[in-house]
């Protein structure tokens, strides 16, 4: 299996009138809404992937450090999980 790149990005999550807004500070256009915290984060990750692909086509960097991700890599991340009251 070949090595892949992973970006560790800060994602800010806020409540808004329609649900939740997730955004990546420092990455223009990287924001998305969702009805839940998880959906907003998932949608924002999709937007980041589109921005990364566009910038790669133009030979531009995403502006964040990439981590080589392979069979020997382990990464611990914190993900928000919405709790229903």
Which ranges hold each PLM region?
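A short, exposed loop/beta-hairpin motif centered on an aromatic-Gly-Thr core
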Residues: 28-39
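Short, charged, surface-exposed hinge/linker loops at domain edges
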Residues: 1-9, 42-85
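Short aromatic-glycine-(Arg/Gly/Cys) micro-motifs in beta-strand/loop hairpins
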Residues: 12-27
């Amino acid at each position: 299996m070949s090595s892949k790149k992973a970006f560790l990005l800060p994602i800010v999550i806020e409540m808004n009138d329609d649900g939740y807004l997730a955004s990546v500070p420092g990455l223009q256009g990287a924001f998305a809404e969702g009805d839940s915290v998880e959906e907003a984060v998932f949608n924002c990750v999709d937007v980041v992937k589109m921005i990364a692909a566009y910038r790669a086509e133009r030979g531009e960097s995403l502006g964040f450090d990439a981590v080589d991700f392979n069979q020997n890599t382990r990464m611990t991340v914190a993900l928000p999980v919405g709790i229903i009251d």
